[in-house]
From Swiss-Prot:
Gene Ontology CC annotations of this record: cytoplasm
SMART domains documented for this protein: DnaJ
The record's free-text note on cofactor binding: Binds 2 Zn(2+) ions per monomer.
Subunit structure: Homodimer.
Family: Belongs to the DnaJ family.
Protein name: Chaperone protein DnaJ
Record: residues binding Zn(2+) 1: 145, 148, 198, 201
Biological source species: Aggregatibacter actinomycetemcomitans (Actinobacillus actinomycetemcomitans)
Cofactor: Zn(2+)
Binding residues annotated for Zn(2+) 2, in chain numbering: 162, 165, 184, 187
Keywords: Chaperone, Cytoplasm, DNA replication, Metal-binding, Repeat, Stress response, Zinc, Zinc-finger
Protein encoded by which gene: dnaJ
Domain notes: The J domain is necessary and sufficient to stimulate DnaK ATPase activity. Zinc center 1 plays an important role in the autonomous, DnaK-independent chaperone activity of DnaJ. Zinc center 2 is essential for interaction with DnaK and for DnaJ activity.
Length: 375
């Protein structure tokens, strides 16, 4: 039976680089490894073919020969080893694979575990969100121990490499091609053997501390935005880099404005006489009061847009708009004289539908509705 093309077998293109070849092999090896397929002969053969393909394509010389001559390059008498595939270090492949799972992949390297990232939720006003501000915050985190300066050992105490894991902080166990890893229980994963642990941090090298920070919040932020403060998270183990602090923004509700992205909305009440006769009013913006001209015969719900009076976008740098929705207020607590004036106004408008456009439109619609019912 003809052999399957090595590139097709690994599911990669002929231009695949070393990393792509290794990634494809890892994925397939995990799927077809005998320890997982539990005696399935067909999958066991498939695993052998995958190993064979990997050794050829991962070797520059063998790959070049395969690209030129195909499988014939490795037949007896061709000078390329007669089809023997025993040279690849598959322990390294599986070691890397499980090293990723357990926090590191190299042999003999001390484990480097970056510190945890932290989250801090902060509440600001709309004005602060629009214009930017600086806030002082206090967080509780793991910081390097001041007593031992992060070493975990008392002054003058010996710190040696763990003789069991040789400083890696992990112990490996290999059965055939299958490799497992677990933290070294002799040094508790630190890779070190400390003669006298620091009494302050008990050998960890880190202690819980309160830390004060000043956070600069840029103009234009909105609820849900995150600010990353690099290196302000928890300290890492064994002198590893600290994690980051993520400050999550929450903008308080405003008593006047509603926000939608870069745009602002507000409701502006006016008297019914101004709505009828027109006039000029002052409306609030985040930059102060501005004048708005109300035309005659303005109805409730009419929208006025004030360009550039919204929020400046952090991405585009352009300011949004402020949209004002007019609310015509009905007067309350009228005296008899005022009520009489309104009655006279109502009488004077009786039958003049052109002066009451909304009422006219509504009544016409009602009439058509009932006319349709009686047909």
């Amino acid at each position: 039976m003809a052999k399957q093309d090595y590139y097709e077998l690994l599911g990669i293109s002929r231009s695949a680089d070393e990393k792509e070849i290794k990634r494809a092999y890892k994925k397939l090896a995990m799927q077809y490894h005998p320890d997982r397929t539990k005696g399935d002969k067909e999958k066991e053969e498939k695993f052998k073919e995958i190993q064979e393909a990997y050794e050829v394509l991962n070797d520059k010389e063998k790959r070049a020969a395969y690209d030129q001559y195909g499988h014939a390059a490795f037949e007896q008498g061709t000078g390329f080893g007669g089809g023997s595939f025993g040279g690849a270090d598959f322990g390294d492949i599986f070691g890397d694979m499980f090293g990723d799972i357990f926090g590191g992949g190299g042999r003999g390297r001390q484990r480097v575990v970056r510190g945890d990232d932290l989250r801090y939720d902060i509440e600001i006003t709309l004005e602060e969100a629009v214009k930017g501000t600086t806030k002082d915050i206090k967080i509780h985190t793991l910081a390097p121990c001041d007593t031992c300066h992060g070493t975990g050992a008392e002054a003058g105490s010996k710190v040696e490499t763990c003789p069991h894991c040789h400083g890696a902080g992990r112990l490996r166990r290999q059965q055939g091609f299958f490799v497992t890893e677990q933290p070294c229980h002799f040094c508790h994963g630190t890779g070190k053997k400390i003669e006298k642990p620091c009494k302050t941090c008990h050998g960890d090298g880190r202690v819980n501390k309160a830390k004060n920070l000043s956070v600069k919040i840029p103009a234009g932020v909105d609820t849900g935005n995150q600010l990353r403060l690099s290196g302000e998270g928890a300290a890492g183990e064994n002198g590893a880099p600290a994690g980051d602090l993520y400050v999550v923004i929450h903008v308080k509700e405003h008593h006047i404005f509603e926000r939608d992205g870069s745009n602002l909305y507000c409701e502006v009440p006016i008297s019914f006489t101004m709505a009828a006769l027109g006039g000029e009013i002052e409306v609030p913006t985040l930059d102060g009061r501005v004048k708005l001209k109300i035309p005659e015969e303005t109805q409730t719900g009419k929208l006025f847009r004030m360009r550039g009076k919204g929020v400046t976008s952090t991405r585009s740098g352009y300011a949004g708009d402020l949209t004002c929705r007019i609310i015509v207020e009905t007067p309350v607590k009228l005296n008899e004289e005022q009520k009489e004036l309104l009655r006279k106004l109502e009488e004077s408008l009786e039958g003049q539908t052109k002066q009451r456009p909304k009422s006219s439109s509504f009544l016409d619609g009602v009439k058509r509705f009932f006319d349709d019912l009686t047909k």
